[in-house]
Amino acid sequence: MRYVIKIWLFTIIVSPLLLALILGAIINDSSFKSILNSYEIIFVMIIVGFLSSIPAMVIFWLIKRFLKNKYSTLTAKIILSIYGFLSVWITFFIVDSGFITRWSEQTIWVLIYSLTIVIGVWTFKNNNKEITE
C-alpha cells in the first residue's frame, strides 16, 4: 500500500509543479515571480488531482495487489505503467473528451500527469514479495 501512496502523492504534487513551470515559463513566457505567485492555483490543482484520481488509484492498488507474488517486479512495473498512463488519459477524457481532437494546454496536462505517474512507478521501489500490504 505504501508503494501506491508514494506514487499517488508523487503524481498529484509533482505534476502541478511541473505544469506551472512548463505552462508558465515556456509556453506563456511568464516570469518566475509570477509563477511563484500562483501557489493558490497549484494548491487547487493538487486537491482536484487528489479527488479526481481516487477511483483510478483504487484500481491501481487492486492491480498491484493482484500482481503481487505472481509476476516479476519488472513485469509488474510495466503493467502498472501502462495502467497508470491509460488511467490518466481516461480520467481526462471523462472530464473533456475534446482534448484528444485538438491540441491545447490541456493536452500538455495529460502528458505531464501521464509521464509523472510512469516515472513514479519506476522511481519507487516495488517489493512484490511483501508479506503485508
Language-model features: locations:
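Juxtamembrane/disordered regions of integral membrane proteins
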Residues: 1-133
